[in-house]
Amino acid sequence: NDHMHPSDVKEGKIELIADCDGLLKVDREKLKKVNSLGEMMIATRHGDTYVKKGDKLAGTRIIPLVIKKEKMETAQAVCSDGPILTLKPFHKKKFAVLTTGNEVYYHRIEDTFTPVIQEKLAEFGAEMIFHEVYDDDASKITDGCRRAMEAGADLVFCTGGMSVDPDDKTPLAIKNTGARIVSYGAPVLPGAMFLLAYAENGTPIVG
């Protein structure tokens, strides 16, 4: 498929190599059908995973020394309407970080999370174009979200103020932008109060 190439045949095996960084998608139903034919196999990485250029995506081979032509044609027919593997290249995005909370705003604690976000998104070629610090004032945070999107941010991060304490205003601020909240809370630690919303223009806002 696009953005990948086969290796040379070695010991009866062919591997697929990624030509770019991206998200690997696997059609599990087609993979199961081919692997259920017998006398052949395809082993892949898990779908919906991040891969880098040069990574091995899959390995395939026939098990016996020879195989009937009809069986190979059946395997080809399974993929006649689309591939088993798809690699979706990453597109460089611009993002904004709104650091929220009285503790950071009044310099009681240091903002240590913004550098973490920058470092992680740099792996995907993303660029931070907007960064401001706010106290626990919902209206200011709401305005900051709007200005970040007006500045061209493809993704907005709001860090801090996400718990259930009375002075944590970030969820309300995100809601007041008019964004549609998809999820508030996730079964992960740290990150149990993770929030995902989409603004009216489709921009993701993450808290």
Name these PLM-found stretches.
Residues N102, A126-G207:
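Short glycine/threonine-rich loop/turn motifs
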Residues N1-I129:
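Short, glycine/charged-enriched hinge/interface segments at domain edges or termini
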